[in-house]
Amino acid sequence: MSLVDLGKKLLEAARAGQDDEVRILMANGAPFTTDWLGTSPLHLAAQYGHYSTTEVLLRAGVSRDARTKVDRTPLHMAASEGHASIVEVLLKHGADVNAKDMLKMTALHWATEHNHQEVVELLIKYGADVHTQSKFCKTAFDISIDNGNEDLAEILQIAMQNQINTNPESPDTVTIHAATPQFIIGPGGVVNLTDETGVSAVQFGNSSTSVLATLAALAEASAPLSNSSETPVVATEEVVTAESVDGAIQQVVSSGGQQVITIVTDGIQLGNLHSIPTSGIGQPIIVTMPDGQQVLTVPATDIAEETVISEEPPAKRQCIEIIENRVESAEIEEREALQKQLDEANREAQKYRQQLLKKEQEAEAYRQKLEAMTRLQTNKEAV
């Protein structure tokens, strides 16, 4: 039996989960070949849930991060199908948990897409980056929201809060964790941003932003300025942390009977803003987002539950526009290609018509010659 045949049989044995057959074929020198899609025996064993076959192939030295023609690894296959045990054995053998396929989707994206909660938890346990975005600017959390899977969304949201966003695609994203003390330094003294409920984490970027404690603390810190009978003075207060944070600067300006809080950073999303305690707030508060988003005004006498609906981040808008442009370009190219094929077909048809006309003319001439020869022969016989 040739090596090509041995390789084909190894693929079929891996697909069927025939461990003994896999061992025999490898002992006889079967190569670790792939099919026309680049699928290896390990891909097939992982896809079809054959745990023992997967272990046999891994011990034999099959590449744990082999790629198909669309850059999918065995881990992608197992995660997509929900085979948690195979996902774990691949990760224990050193498979790349953050490997991306042609769509820039990781195993976590695919497990979330198919609602495999056990696999999602396992991937997070082994260090999967929950901030990674696909080619369509979607994180695993975005996919869970799109699919309406609240349980997965909660798991992923907790993981995002516990992970520092080191995604190179979002360099402006800054995360300040609750463990990092935050203070405001200004004329009103040093104010700790942590409120009685312990809400002190402020996260800038694509995740939710908690600003309730910040608003209350800023208003309380600047209250002496607004109650003073002296000439209004513009006071600037800055947020400092125990660690250096360059991306988040908050300013409070008290002038003209209002308190204006400006959060200076890139790509801030302000989610649902619930009620703010009335204690310590004597004047309206205006929150201005720096990227052209809405302004929220909370009167001191009528503080109610407000919801600010912000536009999509510039990065996501740009990504969507790029995808739309690519789709339009692809449609234009497809129409042009079809038009070229149609023109070519018309030219071929015209050429065939001309050839047919020429053949008909030749046939007519030949028929006339035959008739002339027949008349001549008839005349000779009559003579």
Curated annotation (Swiss-Prot):
Entry's Gene Ontology cellular component terms: nucleus
InterPro entries recorded: Ankyrin-SOCS_Box, Ankyrin_rpt, Ankyrin_rpt-contain_sf
PTM comment text: Acetylated by EP300/p300. Deacetylated by SIRT7, promoting heterotetramerization and activity.
One GO process term, biological-process aspect: positive regulation of transcription by RNA polymerase II
PTM-bearing positions, type N-acetylserine: 2
Sites of N6-acetyllysine modification: 69, 340, 369
UniProt-annotated location(s): Nucleus
GO molecular function, one term: transcription cis-regulatory region binding
Gene3D superfamilies cross-referenced by the UniProt entry: Ankyrin repeat-containing domain
Keyword entries, A-Z: Acetylation, ANK repeat, Nucleus, Repeat, Transcription, Transcription regulation
Repeat (ANK) residue spans along the chain: 5-34, 37-66, 70-99, 103-132, 136-166
UniProt-listed PANTHER family: ANKYRIN REPEAT PROTEIN, GA-BINDING PROTEIN SUBUNIT BETA-1
Subunit structure: Heterotetramer of two alpha and two beta subunits. Interacts with HCFC1, causing repression of transcriptional activity.
The protein's role, per its UniProt record: Transcription factor capable of interacting with purine rich repeats (GA repeats). Acts as a master regulator of nuclear-encoded mitochondrial genes.
Protein name: GA-binding protein subunit beta-1
Species name: Bos taurus (Bovine)
